[in-house]
Design a protein with these regions (language model features):
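Basic phosphate/pyrophosphate-binding loop/patch that engages nucleotide-derived ligands
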Residues: 107-115, 129-143, 242-243
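C-terminal helix-rich "cap/oligomerization" subdomain common to oxidoreductases
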Residues: 1, 65-68, 290-331
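N-terminal Rossmann-like dinucleotide-binding module
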Residues: 1-47
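Beta-strand-loop-alpha-helix segment that lines the small-molecule cofactor/substrate pocket
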Residues: 64-65, 71-72, 76-123, 138
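Hydrophobic residues in well-ordered beta-strands that form the structural core
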Residues: 53, 90-91, 116-118, 147, ...
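NAD(P)-dinucleotide binding in Rossmann-like oxidoreductases
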Residues: 196, 201-207, 218-285
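Short acidic low-complexity segments
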Residues: 50-61
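Rossmann-like dinucleotide-binding domain that binds NAD(P)(H)
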Residues: 158-222, 228-233, 305
């Protein structure tokens, strides 16, 4: 079976997914829709697909699945529409910035027996997958503590920050999902701290640029997350999992893996400059996983429930900062 795709949204992340779909032997990109015709046309020319409206893709009999890469405030409505249309759905995170709206959306997906995958691409990074495999294989015993460091080379434009939902819902949400993925238990308590250390304009926009979070599970396991909108040395992405019998870690990746030693000392190439190059394989792997699940009718993960859980943690972190206390997660 070849899964036939429609792409909704032809912006930066839409281009990433267009490439991932078109590069997969079990998929074909049939059509693209975007509010800006020139953006849609560029993808259509690059991947030999058609430009259609969202309505046409929704009704199309030659499309099995859609990838939603539109602005966040359109995600939930589009998920509901395409679930009712019987299409399998891959949606970039988050489903919505409001937990209540996400729950409403999930009811529609459940009622229609829809297939929904949420784009937490880091689960599909080969290095992070190897960390999870080491845990599953018992190499480090029982997981006790997870440490996640995620720092961007620079802050996004303030206009973006104003509509992003804030750093916890926009940036840390990836790390909330990764913490759940590695802990093996649901966090029940969140303690967060946040500052404006990078750009005062971010603070004026009502957000933070430097945050730390501690998640705790009912059994006492912990995940410690460190985020910053500044890393002068490149895109900083590290994970460590400490267990009862050892530790496993994934270090920063570089575009070229060489090391030079001479009279001037040791030198290595710089880190990747941002997520599109650092997570190239992850984007391809997540689409491949989605395609496989659609073809075989197997369980899809990360699911809508995973998206909801990560957003609930983000909301708890926002509340923790505002009220300067630990926040419990509702069951």
């Amino acid at each position: 079976m070849t899964v036939r795709f429609g792409l909704l949204g032809a912006g930066r992340i839409g281009k990433v997914h267009a490439k991932a779909v078109s590069s997969n032997a079990d998929a074909v990109l049939v059509a693209v829709a975007d509010a800006f015709p020139a953006a849609a046309e560029a993808i259509a020319q690059a991947y030999a697909c058609e430009v259609r409206t969202i309505e046409a893709i929704e009704k199309a009999s030659d499309i099995d699945a859609v990838v939603i890469c539109t602005p966040t405030d359109t995600h939930a409505d589009l998920i509901e529409r395409f679930a009712r249309a019987g299409k399998a759905i891959f949606c970039e995170k988050p489903i919505d910035l409001d937990v209540g709206r996400v729950r409403e959306c999930m009811k529609v997906v459940e009622e229609t027996k829809g297939k929904l995958m949420v784009g937490f691409n880091r689960r599909f990074d080969p290095h992070f997958m190897a960390v999870r495999k080491a845990i599953d294989d018992g190499k480090i015993g029982a997981v006790e503590m997870v440490t996640i460091i995620s720092r961007d080379p620079g802050a996004p434009p303030v206009d973006y920050i104003k509509r992003s939902g804030g750093i916890f819902r926009d940036m840390t949400i990836h790390d909330f999902d990764m913490a759940r993925f590695l802990l093996g238990e649901e966090p029940v308590a969140v303690t967060a701290h946040a500052s404006v250390l990078v750009d005062p304009e971010i603070g004026k926009a009502g957000d933070y640029d430097s945050v730390s979070v501690i998640l705790e599970t009912a059994s006492g396991k912990q995940a410690i997350i460190s985020n910053s909108r500044r890393a002068t040395y490149g895109y900083d992405q590290r994970i460590e999992v400490h267990g009862s019998k050892g530790v496993v870690s994934a270090e920063n990746q570089r575009a070229v893996s060489i090391e030079i030693a001479n009279g001037d000392g040791y030198t290595r190439p710089p880190l990747h400059d941002f997520f599109m190059t650092r997570y190239t394989e992850a984007y391809a792997n997540e689409i491949a996983s989605f395609i496989s699940a659609v073809e075989k009718g197997t369980k899809i993960a990360p699911s809508g429930a995973d998206g909801l859980a990560a957003l609930a943690l983000a909301d708890a972190a926002v509340k923790s900062v505002a009220e300067k206390r630990q926040v419990r997660i509702d069951a």
